[in-house]
A protein has these predicted regions:
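Accessory alpha-helical/coil subdomains and C-terminal extensions
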Residues: 1-41, 61
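Structural beta-strand/beta-sheet cores of well-ordered domains, especially the beta-sheet scaffolds
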Residues: 5-7, 43-45, 97, 173
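Short, hydrophobic beta-strand segments
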Residues: 6-9, 45-50, 203
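Fold-independent oxyanion-binding glycine-rich loops
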Residues: 11-14, 39, 49, 104, ...
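Mixed-charge interfacial surface used for oligomerization/domain docking
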Residues: 20-21, 42, 53, 111-117
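Terminal amphipathic helices with adjacent charged low-complexity linkers/tails
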Residues: 39, 43-61
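Short alpha-helical segments enriched in small residues
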Residues: 56-249, 254-259
Length: 259
């Protein structure tokens, strides 16, 4: 009787081509039974093994899961059925950090992913102390001095609002999504006491994919992990690098691939 085992690795922040290249190399190295699923930027890498005994199947799966995890690096956020939203929430709860959004649009994108999860209200204010409160919302504006110093710079403007949201909401992290404007691709941004990080995204992404990009910024920042390719870092009020759409920010078609 043949025994089987399955391991699932969850990955976010790499392109489909990058993930596929890693899996093809693993296949060339002797790993069989690989399958790749993708939805809203989240990849599920399935490693399945069959062997004469359960112990042998377990050993084979564990060996390749560990090797693939090392190759994926900080893009690996969980194993099994854990979503990126759950991984980001777990990081916030573990570090006892509070997240806020600068505006209703951003709050809706993040809130739609976090609301179904247990204890999410302990890590995200859902606007109660920020954009959903009329008094607080009036305080979260682009600082006039920033507008005068960086006229037309929507990245600086978003960072300025995020800084104010941090203060108003007494939070640890503030996130913002900005749709495309003249001369600037849409982007996601996170601000904390150390500064700001931002990453351009494709205008073709779904709401869930945008929310995932926001929450991946949160996960990586909370856990002290490396940022994805194309992410810029800067101090609000100071010059920042150009923000361009990286390959990881391009839309990825939902698909299933077997290797």
């Amino acid at each position: 009787m043949v025994s089987t085992q399955l391991r699932i690795l969850r990955v976010f922040g790499l392109t489909s081509a990058e993930v596929t290249a890693i899996l093809r190399q693993a296949q060339a190295d002797g790993c069989t039974g690989l399958r790749l699923l993708e939805r809203d930027g989240e990849f599920a890498v399935c490693v399945q093994a069959s062997a004469p005994t359960q112990a042998m199947a377990d050993e084979h799966c564990d060996k390749w899961a560990q090797k693939l995890a090392a190759r994926f690096g900080d893009a690996l956020y969980a194993t099994g059925e854990t979503s990126l939203a759950q991984a980001a929430l777990d990081a916030l709860l573990k570090k006892r950090r509070l997240l806020v959004a600068t505006d209703e649009t951003t709050g809706r994108l993040v809130g739609a992913l976090l609301r179904p999860l247990k204890h999410s209200e302990a890590a995200f204010d859902f606007g109660t102390q920020t954009y959903a409160d009329p008094v607080s919302a009036r305080k979260i504006i682009t600082p006039p001095g920033l507008l005068n110093r960086f006229p037309g710079d929507v990245v600086q403007a978003a960072a300025g609002r995020a800084q104010l949201a941090l203060s108003v909401g007494q939070a640890d992290y503030a996130v913002c999504y900005m749709p495309a404007t003249v001369g600037q691709a849409p982007f996601v941004l996170l601000c904390d006491r150390r500064g700001a990080v931002a990453c351009a995204v494709s205008p073709e992404l779904t709401d869930a994919a945008i929310g995932n990009n926001l929450l991946d910024l949160v996960r990586r920042r909370a856990l002290g992990l490396k940022n994805t390719a194309g992410t810029i870092q800067f101090r609000p009020g100071h010059e920042h690098p150009l923000l361009l759409v990286s390959r990881a920010g391009q839309p990825k078609p939902g698909d299933t691939s077997r290797f």
